[in-house]
């Protein structure tokens, strides 16, 4: 949704008969507001401010005794502007993480280098608006906070250990600094039941799904820390942290709707990726409607080898391939690219026969411009000492074979390995001690 479309939606909602509130004496208004707040509190728990769309937030602010109109469009926009920049909308005195950049996502999509934005002047919400949020029975606080942060100086990667307010569970998200931009890797579950042989999170086993509020809290924290640390613009977002996104599809779908809204978190869907091992063809079919780029963590192109690496997988690679092809066909033409990911392991899936098998898997179902193969050298994990990453020479040879087969192919550099923040390493010792270890 564009910013203009969002504004038109806000105006339409506020102009509707449901948004009309007849003039009543001030005392009566306050009494009614208190009664309505009490009823709302009884009927349903509050939602985090991060998961309330601007048009709904405008109506909610309009219910406050401090409201000047029944639909507070401008105040809702100021709240979301603060959220987008990493400010705390409940704290009008938040000093703001003033250094850093915001940048233009359009320019970044076109490959331009974006200069740093001017330093901010503090929070974007007034004390009045902060009070309106604080006293609302329907608006809840941000659902998570950073428990600990660690830094890999060699790569500039920063891991945030995030404690969830609901039950104290821990998840991780990672800020990855590139040359002219920053990427954020977020989690969708506590633990993961897919049990990939090379993944530390899979070793934790199944914990629980994250709520929409908890997913979006990671996004907000990423924006907040990127600004505090004066990182390049945070414009890339990937669901490649803890958990299998398609096993928590309803929450991931709802979170993505706000992540990619121009008047909410304002990430481009071209720069937002949902990565999955594809639990089933049905999961993949449902994935097609997501406002994000799709990525398939295939890891091996033959069933025998893939089931050793992903032991919970019960569907053939051909079934899953056809499901991805159908999902892409249902999307708009400009969103029909699939990223195919392989975690390369020495002597396991990095040979010439593995490259040929991948080409033979992809070629019948996809055109050249639909596929980007991304090779990820495995990062070491304590529970699988016999597995190690493919050598640079093996990765380059695999890449050349894929190029010769007619598909684009990149080799991802490892980042965050020193701080156990790289792909496959997102597992918290505290969570393992809490009983998620099999």
Q: What are these regions, as identified by a protein language model?
A:
Residues 185, 307-308, 436:
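Short, charged, solvent-exposed linker or helix-capping segments at domain edges/interfaces
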Residues 2-9:
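Sec-dependent signal peptide recognition
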Residues 223-401, 405:
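Conserved AdoMet/S-adenosylmethionine-binding subsite of the radical SAM
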Residues 11, 15, 20-167, 328-337, ...:
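Auxiliary Fe-S-binding modules of radical SAM enzymes
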Residues 95-123, 128, 132, 168-292, ...:
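Conserved Radical SAM active-site core
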